[in-house]
């Protein structure tokens, strides 16, 4: 118990130390925004992984794997009629990749591979040439190569050991781009920059920084904040669009984000931003533990009787109440908020419950994000 509390206090201390920087931090535009015309595109394909050591799909349970093997062999000129395949060295997989903006034919991207059937491991396998298509149905890349699997699995007659995921992996630089996305970047007259974390203050500040640069370089304003996420930049007549974008993305802008508390109930992780404030509120936290114990007793019949052995149930219920400490929270600063929460001495799940209750009471002046 003491070790858990110490770890929890250390976690809060690290979070507090990380948030000692000013609320308004200076960042380059390339670090906080991206070009709307330069977004990523998703690719997907279906393929086969070969060379597995008996850890592939069982063809009876995965008929699509058998069909794919036969189709591949027929394309290679090998007849499979009249034969029954019993191999366990092949697995059917889905292959995904991200096509970066302005990618040219011949460049390479990483691909992710995931099993479709009942294969137990893809370790040591090789992805056979697989076409990757976009949402429009066009083929943009072809993937092939050895799969890297980080997890492992070992199994014996009476025990098994596994760590990580063995049915998914990656092929570094495994896809070659064959077709480039149509782009009108050079022919465009406007640029739209999109903030990764939408905020009106940051958008207005970004437009002001761009206009300050444009006034000195071109003698006029060229940027306008459209909303909390988008900033429109108009291309000057004599400017080169690529060089203009290179100059803009290196400008420094003051970024700002709203006060936010992020809670992950599955892992017990809590992240509290520096701008989070709590109005004065009293919090009492206590835990009720109920333990139910079953100790059945075997009852034997009397000698020479015709009775039968029976099991008599015996249930014991114990209830214990811990905690109940009342603390006054007045989070005028992150330091006082963390100190107030730690003074109660609760576990992470208790902190989550307290934050939710404070938000319901209207005392938490921040957005509460539950994951």
UniProtKB/Swiss-Prot annotation:
Coiled coil: none annotated. Its main location: periplasm. One of its GO terms (cellular component) is bacterial-type flagellum basal body, distal rod, P ring. GO terms for biological process: bacterial-type flagellum-dependent cell motility. GO terms for molecular function: structural molecule activity. The keyword Signal applies. It comes from the Bacteria. Residues 1-25 form the signal peptide. It holds the Pfam family FlgI. Keywords: Bacterial flagellum, Periplasm, Signal. It is found in: Periplasm; Bacterial flagellum basal body. The keyword Signal applies. Disulfide bonds: none annotated. The basal body constitutes a major portion of the flagellar organelle and consists of four rings (L,P,S, and M) mounted on a central rod. PANTHER family: FLAGELLAR P-RING PERIPLASMIC PROTEIN FLGI, FLAGELLAR P-RING PROTEIN. Assembles around the rod to form the L-ring and probably protects the motor/basal body from shearing forces during rotation. Belongs to the FlgI family. This is Flagellar P-ring protein. It comes from Sinorhizobium fredii (strain NBRC 101917 / NGR234).
């Amino acid at each position: 118990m003491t070790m858990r509390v110490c770890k929890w206090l250390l976690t809060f201390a690290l979070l507090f130390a990380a948030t000692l920087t000013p609320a308004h931090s200076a960042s380059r535009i390339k670090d906080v925004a991206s070009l709307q015309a330069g977004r990523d595109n998703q690719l997907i394909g279906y393929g086969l992984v070969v060379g597995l050591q008996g850890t592939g799909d069982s063809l009876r349970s995965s008929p699509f794997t058998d069909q794919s093997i036969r189709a591949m062999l027929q394309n290679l000129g090998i007849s499979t009629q009249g034969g029954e395949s019993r191999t366990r060295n092949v697995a059917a997989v889905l292959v995904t990749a991200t096509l970066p903006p302005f990618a040219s034919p011949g460049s390479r991207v990483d691909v992710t591979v995931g099993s479709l059937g009942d294969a137990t491991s893809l370790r040591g396998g090789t992805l056979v040439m697989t076409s990757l298509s976009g949402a429009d149905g066009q083929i943009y890349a072809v993937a092939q190569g050895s799969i890297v699997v980080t997890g492992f699995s070992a199994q014996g007659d009476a025990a098994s050991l596994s760590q990580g995921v063995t049915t998914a992996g990656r092929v570094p630089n495994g896809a070659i781009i064959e077709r480039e996305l149509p782009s009108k970047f050079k022919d465009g007259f406007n640029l739209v920059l999109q903030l990764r974390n939408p905020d009106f203050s940051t958008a207005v500040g970004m437009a002001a920084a761009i206009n300050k640069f444009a006034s000195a370089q071109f003698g006029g304003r060229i940027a306008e904040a459209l909303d909390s996420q988008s900033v429109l930049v108009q291309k000057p007549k004599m400017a080169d669009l690529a060089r203009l974008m290179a100059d803009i993305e290196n400008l420094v802008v003051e970024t700002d984000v709203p006060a936010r508390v992020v809670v992950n109930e599955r892992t017990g992780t809590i992240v509290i931003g520096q701008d989070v404030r709590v109005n004065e509120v009293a919090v009492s936290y206590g835990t009720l533990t109920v333990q139910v114990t079953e100790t059945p007793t075997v009852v034997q019949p009397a000698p020479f009787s015709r009775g039968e052995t029976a099991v008599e149930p015996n249930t014991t219920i114990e209830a214990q109440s811990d905690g109940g400490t009342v603390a006054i929270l007045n989070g005028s600063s992150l330091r006082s908020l963390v100190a107030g929460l730690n003074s109660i001495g609760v576990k992470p799940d208790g902190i989550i419950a307290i934050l939710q209750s404070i938000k319901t009471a209207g005392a938490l002046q921040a957005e509460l994000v539950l994951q």
